[in-house]
């Protein structure tokens, strides 16, 4: 990553908009970021880190805490960082959470954190991400480093340079893994571990399956399974033999019972046949009646055709007679219609004799109509010409007025353009005045803020003072209480000793043999614990008193500092004769309105408008001249049309001068002609049609008479045939015939009943004779004893079957379990063999054996050796041959992973020791060497991550002059190799030796930047 441009606005100590163009420093520059303490040198690194990751280099402050207190309310806190990575250019813009003025009304509103990442291309920018989280992920993917790793390898923040040096193996593994892209080895470790864990899990599942399989049959071990299988085999064989014997006995008993049951059913059937035959013979009379009914129906069936013909002939004769009567009526109607149509046709022909006279009148009126139409066209042309003349006159007048108006507008615009030119000379003066007012307002607001802080601090100081006095009183009270308890305890102890004194024996305290005035105690009993608790409470109150006094004292210092700052600022403002805040704001508003009004001025636009107006004026004058010509032409056209109209009016008679009346008369005549002609044509057609209708009806009448004669003849013939049929069939009349006649279905039904009766008679008789012959020499059996034997045999067989089924089911379950166990043991042996290989590889790859070094750390250890080789060369140079960096090879204690920890060799003592034992300056040189070595090796391996840039924040102040020169020379060598190196320091020697410099200048209204090349 190579920085190209950094823009800061209202960020950190920078109140305004500051821009750093790194390209002006040249390719791979070595430059110094210089400035006083607190000016904002580290804020530049914070801005780069915050733009990329949304976090500052030290992580002590969040984005919303980076807003400059001196920034104008409407100025957004924003960082824009443009950088180059792998030949591609990117720009990232980030704005933290912040309060901004409302667009409408007063007050502030919260603006949420926003971020945008764009790829800068020659053919247009490409948006990569436009929200904080997606931007952070995209930056990690592009850089190959997260924020913590970025701070450790590309930025050595102030006070953080030891972290890269003293990081443990786990932290260094994460950094190197990202830099060298060795995730493949971690994936191998994880894959082996997961595969081994999966095999272990499968093996445990198989063990559980074995236990579960045995538990299904209620056993706990395979020995029990084999024992039961051996013991159950003969028992199952005996049960099977017993079942076969009982089943054979049941079959024989059941066969005997079945034969006796069939014989009993035959005897019962013989008795039933006697009853059924008697019942069947009762239907003989009904069957005979059906036979006679069938015979009569068969006779009637032979007369059916003759009877139908006779009835049809009578029906046809009646229809023919009715037809003759209908046709006779129609013939009379047709003759009357023919006569009426003939009279109507003659009358229509007489009326049509008026048509020629009407046609002549119509033609005369149509000629007059043509002249009136011509006159109307000329009148319309005259009206149009008058309108065109009026329009031309009005247009000429409008153009004349527009021309005069344009000339006046142009004159006004020229005057306004000259006035704007004069006013614009005041804009820069007003802007400068506005900047001065903004600074003065900010200063007055700072003064007001300090005044508020002072009031708040004074109130807090009063609270701290009151709190201190209260706690001091409590501490004094606790001391009095503890003193009283301790005195009472000593008095109590003296009284206890006095009780033990004996006359003429020495006192253990004073040695006297006489004890005239023994100590006495009459108060409450006091224990040593109570005294100690009271003293502890006293100490607690004393501690709280000290803390309260310290807080009071600190608040006093803070209040004094605020008062001093307020006094200094107020004095400066008074010295500069700065107006009061409300006056400044009023002036600012007036000036803002004036500047806004001046910024609205646009003399260039007005100049273009003047030029366009001049072009419009010339065009308007040209159009006016053409319009005058059109007006003259319109006068001539109107005069010609008026003369033509007067001539046409003289040719038309007065009585035909109205066009609508004339057209109405023509229409009436034309309509009358059409009505007469149509009436004649219609009457003639109706007469012809009536003649045709009369002839047709007359022919139909003759045909109806002939059909009636034929129907009468057929009726006579069928009547004779019907009378002969009745005579030969034996029926007395038509009623007797109809009574005997049956439908085909009825006859079929009678024949079916007769056939069924005869078939059943034969069947019952045959079955009775067969049973009589079969049972002639047999006795009727007794079924009850046989049924008892069958039931007993069936019960014995069921018991034998139940016993066999139980034994067989148990045997099947045991054999199934035995087979499942065999399959499980075979699979388990395969898993054990696989785990011997995979498990061993997993333990080795994950660092669970030997030196506790995983495969990933082993690979990184080799890479770290290369890094340390490069780093040691620089460290040897900077430490004047004293120190070398080396990887710690001893195994860490316990289960902690190792393999990437660092040690340093001290050539003065000849011993190796931990890098944490280095001094501040030595640690800085070692960390710098390690960072530079890491940069060399990463770029040499070309793993997709390029460490083209290194920022170092402080640390040079801990070096002596000679070490400082060596460190600078090392950085110069690195810079000549194509690296961009930025150093943040206030060390004077660096300022003298490094020509490229970015100065951070601190002012009362915020810091500014100045690039010196």
From Swiss-Prot:
Residues 242-262, 281-486, 604-717, 739-838 form a coiled coil. One of its GO terms (biological process) is DNA replication. One of its GO terms (molecular function) is ATP hydrolysis activity. Heterodimer of SbcC and SbcD. It comes from Vibrio cholerae serotype O1 (strain ATCC 39315 / El Tor Inaba N16961). SbcCD cleaves DNA hairpin structures. These structures can inhibit DNA replication and are intermediates in certain DNA recombination reactions. The complex acts as a 3'->5' double strand exonuclease that can open hairpins. It also has a 5' single-strand endonuclease activity. This is Nuclease SbcCD subunit C. Disulfide bonds: none annotated. GO terms for cellular component: DNA repair complex. Belongs to the SMC family. SbcC subfamily. It comes from the Bacteria. The lineage of its organism: Bacteria, Pseudomonadati, Pseudomonadota, Gammaproteobacteria, Vibrionales.
